[in-house]
Amino acid sequence: MEDQVGFGFRPNDEELVGHYLRNKIEGNTSRDVEVAISEVNICSYDPWNLRFQSKYKSRDAMWYFFSRRENNKGNRQSRTTVSGKWKLTGESVEVKDQWGFCSEGFRGKIGHKRVLVFLDGRYPDKTKSDWVIHEFHYDLLPEHQRTYVICRLEYKGDDADILSAYAIDPTPAFVPNMTSSAGSVVNQSRQRNSGSYNTYSEYDSANHGQQFNENSNIMQQQPLQGSFNPLLEYDFANHGGQWLSDYIDLQQQVPYLAPYENESEMIWKHVIEENFEFLVDERTSMQQHYSDHRPKKPVSGVLPDDSSDTETGSMIFEDTSSSTDSVGSSDEPGHTRIDDIPSLNIIEPLHNYKAQEQPKQQSKEKVISSQKSECEWKMAEDSIKIPPSTNTVKQSWIVLENAQWNYLKNMIIGVLLFISVISWIILVG
C-alpha cells in the first residue's frame, strides 16, 4: 500500500510522541512500533547515509528513527558524526495532544521537539546545511527515564535525487573513481528491484566494489602462460592437474616445489647428507649387526668409521654398502684389517635393497676406495685403542657404546677418590 500514490508513513507530532515514543520508552513495543521505526545511533551515520536505515520508503524526504540518549557531557548530548556534527538551533516547541487520543486520554502538553542543523565538516565556510533533524522528547516521565527520542530526518534542498530513498548524495564524503560501473556508489538498478534499503555507507560500497573490480581485471589481464615451470609440470603429472582445475581463473605466482614442501627442508636434507659421517662415533670398535644377511663365517675385528668422503656419500644416499658396517663375534676376539675380510664388503643394512642385488659390483668399488685411502686407515687404526671386549650396537644408523659408560663410571670413581684423599689430607693436617 505504501507504494501507491498518496499513501505513506506520515505521522504527526502528537502521534510520534504520544504513541510511538511513549510505547518505546515504556517497553510496550507493539508490532506497529517495531515495524514502523528503526532504532539507530544517529551519530554513527552522516545524513546522506542515515536515510538508508529507515524501515519505510519515503517520497517526502522524511525518515524516522529511534535514538537512545547519550549524555556524555552532563545534560548535553554528543552529536558529532563522521563528517560533521549536528548543531542545536532555535527554541524548543511544545507538542500537545489536543484530544488525548495518542496519550491514553491525557490532554495537553505531552512533549517537545527541537531542531538541529547539520554542519558539514568538509565545507567549514558553509554555515547552512540542507539536512535538518526534528528531535522529539516525551515529557510525562522523569528525566532519568527518558531513554529514547524520535528523530525525523528531513532534506530541505532542491536536489530531486534525494527525494528517492535509493538516490545517492550529490556530494559524498569520499569521492570514488566514477569511471567504472563497479566503482559507483550505489548500484541503482539492483536497488530499485530490491525491497530493502542499502545499509552500507557510500564510501564502503564504492571502495569495496572498486577493489573487487580491480582484482578481477588483474586476473583477466594476466592469462596463463603457454608453458609451465618444470616443477609445476612435475606436480601436474603426479596429481592429475587437480589443483589447476580448482583454480583455473587464478595465475600461479610462486612456483610449487613438488619434491619438498619448502626450501628449508631441502637445505636440512643437504646438511644431513654432507655431515652424516660426523653423526657416527669415531671410536667404534666392533659392531653387532642384526641384519639377516650375515657372512658364512663369523669374523671379528675393529673397523673405523671415517673411511673416505666418496665412500660415506655412497653409503647414505646411493644405497650402497658402508665401510662402517662390521660384524662382531664373541668367538674370535681380535683386530682384523678390513682388506682381509672380503665378506664385509657385501654386508648391507636390512632396508638396502639395491646393494643386495648388486654385491659384486659394490665389492669392487669398496676395494678400490679402500686402496686409495690406505694411509687414512692406518692413521685411524693407530688412533683407536679400545679393548676387544667393547660391544657396540648399531640401530637406525646411531652407534651406542658401552665403553662410554665405563669411561664415565671410571671418571666419577676417580673424582670421588680424589675428593676423599683431599679430605683425608685436610683432616690429618
From Swiss-Prot:
Pfam families: NAM. Residues 319-331 have a biased composition (Low complexity). Its main location: membrane. The chain crosses the membrane at residues 408-428. Keywords: Activator, DNA-binding, Membrane, Nucleus, Stress response, Transcription, Transcription regulation, Transmembrane, Transmembrane helix. Residues 184-210, 289-341 are annotated as: Disordered. It comes from Arabidopsis thaliana (Mouse-ear cress). This is NAC domain-containing protein 1. The lineage of its organism: Eukaryota, Viridiplantae, Streptophyta, Embryophyta, Tracheophyta. Gene3D superfamilies: NAC domain (2.170.150.80). Induction: By cold, drought stress and methyl methanesulfonate (MMS) treatment. GO terms for molecular function: DNA-binding transcription factor activity; transcription cis-regulatory region binding. GO terms for cellular component: membrane; nucleus. The NAC domain includes a DNA binding domain and a dimerization domain. The keyword Cell membrane does not apply. Expressed in roots, rosette leaves, cauline leaves, shoot apex, stems and flowers. InterPro entries: NAC-dom, NAC_dom_sf. Residues 10-160 form the NAC domain.
